[in-house]
Curated annotation (Swiss-Prot):
PROSITE patterns: GIY_YIG. This is UPF0213 protein PSPA7_1257. SUPFAM superfamilies: GIY-YIG endonuclease. It comes from the Bacteria. InterPro entries: GIY-YIG_endonuc, GIY-YIG_endonuc_sf, UPF0213_domain. Pfam families: GIY-YIG. Belongs to the UPF0213 family.
Length: 104
């Protein structure tokens, strides 16, 4: 375990994946160890270039993850979802399968 990782574990620093809704209705997905602070950064016009064309309007989803690596993997999975699937995620309906995907 690296010194930085040990310090993170000692401080109880946790990572989350989050979704922010932009003014145009688009959803932005990211990770942070402090989603509320990161949302404030997005709202202030700093942070992701995504919000240059349409400002951040609401932090609509936060999911705690066990590690930064887990948060990155979950972010990638969420970004791969269709807009419709992301919207279902927001209302708590699990995405079991996308249209066109083979049954597992």
């Amino acid at each position: 375990m690296s010194e930085a990782t040990a310090a993170t574990v000692a401080l109880g620093k946790s990572w989350s994946v989050y979704l922010v809704r932009a003014a145009n209705g688009a959803l932005y997905c990211g990770i942070s160890d402090d989603p509320l602070r990161r949302f404030d950064t997005h709202c202030s016009g700093k942070g992701a270039r995504f919000f240059h064309s349409s400002p951040a309007r609401a932090l609509v989803y936060v999911e705690a993850c066990a590690s930064k690596g887990d948060a990155l993997r979950r972010e990638r999975a969420i970004k791969a979802l269709s807009k419709r699937a992301k919207e279902r995620l927001l209302v708590g309906v699990p995405v079991l399968r996308e249209v066109g995907e083979p049954a597992i």
